[in-house]
Amino acid sequence: MALWIYVVPPLAGLVIGYFTNDIAIKMLFRPYRAYRIFGWRIPFTPGLIPQNQPRLAKQIAKTIMGSLLTPEELHNLARKLLRTERMQAGIRWLLGVALDRLQNPEQQQQTAQVLARILADLFNESLPRLVKVLARQETFLEGPINQLFDQVLLELRLNAEQARQLSEWILKQALPPKVLRQNLVDFLTDRNIEALDEEFRERATGSYWLVANLFGLKNALLRLRTYCLEEPEGAEAILEDLLKDINAPRRLTEILQNLSLQNLPVSAVRQLRRALRDGIQDYLRSQGPEVIKGLGESIDWEKVASLVLGRLRNSKALIASIDQISADLALILERYLERDLESLMMQVIPVLNLDQVIADKVNATSPAELEQAIQQIVRQELQAIVNLGGLLGFLVGCVQVLFLLR
């Protein structure tokens, strides 16, 4: 009997079984495009997969989203990605990048401009509105004002040097002889002179009563006023000598040095504190927003921002606190995500539109690239199936030999 009966069927089965997968894959993809003869499309062109690639892409996306990337799997994946250690490392990296940015003069200038705009908007827009809203409350700044009064104004007392300087300023700038003379003239009106004369006549006793009723004060006060008007320099010289004779600087210094709110009665102090608080609150209600806005417009915010960034750049405390800050922020995010991660994922999944992304990616891949990818998977991951196909083909060939020998 011829040798080919024993050899050809097993070898043919082996070859067919081994290369069937490659042939089947090529038949699914090829040809890549349609061929036409006289405008008539040849059947089975293009291949099955290129012809139905859009529908296949949607089916692949549906399968992946329905079986692999389910909301539960995405939720678990997000939990793994957003573990505290990873979030802390990410926040630490961001803070490090921000600090490195401050070391670059050009980038620091850009950051300063951004920070300046933020500070200006906060001070010129947000803060006035906040003050306007808070000022409507009856207790607005009540605590700070009371604390300021109790700890600063109530304890305020001038030392000897401060009292001396203030007394000199009062006598030389606020109340010099010229001002005293003018105030005296303004005070000695006809009406005031009449009132003083009558009061003196009514209250004088003893020898003063005789002087008051015989001579009175009216003529003396009229002459004093006339002298101050007609001889201003002489009147000022007299007032200056009078201040020296009574040692006004020393006396005023002693008065100022001994001046303290603690010497007032408790009721007077409380009333003064209440009046101060009400005055500040009323002023802030009426003029506070405009004053704050005007103050903000007069500030060079870019310079302020540069100073702040300079302090932050050289702050050892900030650099040493980066780990602690990142850990605290990570814990805050973790508590927030534990509560709202599921709802966030339900909102994020439609926004991501993963099924459409997968379908678009499949549609954007050429049939040749798809074929190459599947062939690579078969060779690397499914080689056992290829070998099994060859083995089955060989066994089928052996069975055929048995049938031929019968």
Curated annotation (Swiss-Prot):
InterPro entries for this protein: DUF445 (IPR007383), UCP032178 (IPR016991)
UniProt keyword list = Cell inner membrane, Cell membrane, Membrane, Transmembrane, Transmembrane helix
Transmembrane portions of the chain: 1-21, 385-405
Where is this gene product found? Cell inner membrane
What's the chief localization of this chain?
Answer: membrane
Answer whether the UniProt record assigns the keyword Zinc to this protein.
no
Identify one Gene Ontology CC term for this UniProt entry. plasma membrane
Among PANTHER family, the record links this protein to: UPF0754 MEMBRANE PROTEIN YHEB
Sequence similarity:
Belongs to the UPF0754 family.
Instruction: Report the protein name in the record.
Output: UPF0754 membrane protein CYA_0973
Q: Which organism is it from?
A: Synechococcus sp. (strain JA-3-3Ab)
